[in-house]
């Protein structure tokens, strides 16, 4: 049985119970869905092509900075207005184009720290407006990241937002335990290493609190994760901690499931296949990738420019003749497409690494 056999909506953006079914199926079949950060229609297309070609479900997500870029750098963002508008624009674009690729897509928003809560509020306003018209939220899910705050305030505030999302059957991802490194303007490179590891007791408290509100939630637990890419050996991941979290929650709740918690792997760029495989075996259903894909996109553009540099120095004139036009080389559709190709190839690798290929 494949993913499409269990979903009520087979292609395009899925919501509510379909998201829950997808994550349940992922745990049962021991695979995780790549969560790809997108910042433009071009990166959306690259990711969707990879999922189609690998016959796989995919998660597309926009960060606060990525959403602002989607809106345009000329739009003011002092009150998160560009990030709200850009996220909504990305959502409508993805909803419009995703069915053409014949795959199920989870439409998600990435890290929302305390200072960015107005961004989340604005998107939830849009979700509720969309829900009134279509009986489903605009976004499949959101991510609230209050891991830098006290555990108590983190859980209390996350619960408040889950209560708002629950009537729409909207998924909410939360983070406990800081992910190191730097991403999208949030810098945790100097945090104490002990802060990178979540305790089982905290996972249970979160699970108990949130499950009383809604089943539509997942937890990004810290097990040494770091955003960005670093030299081998500089990042010490301990995926085995995730197994302890599952066992502790199972014991405390008396659950019949060996993996009662839907877990998320943040800071996936640069991790080894073995680390991915082990984490997924402990109930990770979503793995975030961003930095690797940024570099993959660049590599296609870079290689094209270096290879064709003699055709890119002027609009007219190249090694074939001083009157020869170069439009077919400098047309943005040409070199942007090269970036899409290399990014798509890297996303395809992720489907293989996470055992997601041919799961539809």
From Swiss-Prot:
Its cofactor is Zn(2+). The active site is at residue 110. Induction: Preferentially expressed in yeast cells, the host parasitic phase. Disulfide bonds: none annotated. It catalyses: beta-D-fructose 1,6-bisphosphate = D-glyceraldehyde 3-phosphate + dihydroxyacetone phosphate. Zn(2+) 1 binds at residues 111, 227, 266. The keyword Lyase applies. One of its GO terms (cellular component) is cytosol. Dihydroxyacetone phosphate binds at residues 228, 267-269. InterPro entries: Aldolase_TIM (IPR013785), FBA_II (IPR000771), Fruct_bisP_bact (IPR006411). Keywords: Glycolysis, Lyase, Metal-binding, Zinc. Zn(2+) 2 binds at residues 145, 175. Binds 2 Zn(2+) ions per subunit. One is catalytic and the other provides a structural contribution. GO terms for molecular function: fructose-bisphosphate aldolase activity; zinc ion binding. GO terms for biological process: gluconeogenesis; glycolytic process. Homodimer. PANTHER family: FRUCTOSE-BISPHOSPHATE ALDOLASE, FRUCTOSE-BISPHOSPHATE ALDOLASE CLASS 2. Catalyzes the aldol condensation of dihydroxyacetone phosphate (DHAP or glycerone-phosphate) with glyceraldehyde 3-phosphate (G3P) to form fructose 1,6-bisphosphate (FBP) in gluconeogenesis and the reverse reaction in glycolysis. This is Fructose-bisphosphate aldolase 1. It comes from Paracoccidioides lutzii (strain ATCC MYA-826 / Pb01) (Paracoccidioides brasiliensis).
């Amino acid at each position: 049985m494949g993913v499409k056999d269990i979903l009520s909506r087979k292609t395009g953006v899925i919501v509510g119970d379909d998201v829950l079914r997808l994550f349940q199926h992922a745990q049962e079949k021991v695979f995780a869905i790549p969560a790809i950060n997108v910042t433009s229609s071009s990166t959306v297309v690259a990711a969707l092509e990879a999922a189609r070609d690998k016959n796989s479900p995919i998660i597309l997500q926009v960060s606060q900075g990525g959403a602002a870029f989607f809106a345009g750098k000329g739009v003011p963002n002092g009150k998160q207005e560009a990030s709200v508008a850009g996220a909504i624009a990305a959502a409508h674009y993805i909803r419009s184009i995703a069915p053409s690729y014949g795959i199920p897509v989870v439409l998600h928003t990435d890290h929302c720290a305390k200072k960015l809560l107005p961004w989340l509020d604005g998107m939830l306003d849009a979700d509720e407006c969309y829900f009134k018209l279509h009986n489903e939220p605009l976004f499949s899910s959101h991510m609230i990241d209050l891991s830098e705050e006290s555990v108590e305030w983190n859980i209390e505030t996350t619960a408040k937002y889950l209560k708002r999302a629950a009537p729409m059957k909207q998924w909410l991802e939360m983070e406990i335990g800081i992910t190191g490194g730097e991403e999208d303007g949030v810098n945790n490179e100097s945090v104490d290493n002990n802060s990178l590891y979540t305790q089982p007791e905290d996972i249970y408290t979160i699970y108990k609190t949130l499950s009383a509100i809604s089943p539509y939630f997942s937890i990004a637990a810290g097990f040494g994760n770091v955003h960005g890419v670093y030299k081998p050996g500089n990042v010490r991941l301990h995926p085995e901690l995730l197994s302890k979290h599952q066992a502790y929650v199972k014991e405390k709740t008396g659950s019949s499931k060996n993996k009662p918690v839907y877990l998320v792997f943040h800071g996936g760029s640069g991790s080894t296949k073995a680390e991915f495989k082990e984490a997924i075996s402990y109930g990770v259903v979503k793995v975030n990738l961003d930095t690797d894909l940024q570099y993959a996109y660049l590599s296609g553009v870079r290689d094209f420019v270096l290879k064709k540099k003699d055709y890119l120095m002027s609009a007219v004139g190249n090694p074939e003749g001083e009157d020869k036009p170069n439009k077919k080389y400098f047309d943005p559709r040409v070199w942007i497409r090269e970036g899409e190709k290399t990014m798509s190839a890297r996303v395809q690798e992720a489907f293989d690494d996470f055992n997601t290929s041919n799961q539809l």
